[in-house]
Amino acid sequence: ILKKLRFFRMDLTSLRYMTQAGGKLPVNLHREFAEYAMSTGRKFIVMYGQTEATARMSYLPAKDAIRKCGSMGIAIPGGKFRIMEDSSTEVKEPDTVGELVYSGPNVTMGYAECAADLEKGDERGGVLFTGDMAKRDAEGYYYITGRKKRFLKMYGKRVNMDEIEQLLRGRYEGVEIACTGEDDRMRIYMEGMDPASCEEVEKFLT
């Protein structure tokens, strides 16, 4: 939408900050906005959050917008992230994917579906299992890789359907791509693709 409005050509002398949140920003758009901000003396800040944590859990400092392109950044002051293999096993190694878990004073106490639920008190204890899969690099910056529910276990290996979609979009530009499936089979839908290229796609993924 901003491109159609010719945002990058607008005379916005009062604009000092640009922020983004609400969904993972594609790396190419992240880089484009970061480079625009740097070239015009503005600050571009990417953020990550969920309603259950009062909207914000992380931010990517403007100075790292290009260097850490694609990252959701680091935890906000007072907060902390962990990468968990399961509910009790923390992943310590960098660049290893697991569920992103946040701890902080801004985590909701829980959900009340009736008046009696209000008496339960704090059910979360300041800890939120986000349902997002992520990894942490060697410098402590976090990257969302997909949703926990969008993983399949095929031939003993965990397959991220979000990563497969991104991989194919990078190779086949202009093609609409969606993945779905069960643990024993993944289905890939590609609109705008020559049916004769199916074998090529299969070889590319294997």
Protein language model annotation of sequence segments:
Residues 2-68, 80, 87:
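Gly/Ser/Thr-rich phosphate-binding loop
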Residues 20-23, 50, 103-105, 155-157:
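Glycine-rich beta-strand-to-loop/alpha-helix junction loops that act as flexible
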Residues 64-71, 118-123:
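Short, P/G- and charge-enriched loop/turn segments at secondary-structure junctions
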Residues 82, 89-90, 141-143:
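Residue-level signal for well-ordered, solvent-exposed loop/turn and beta-edge residues enriched
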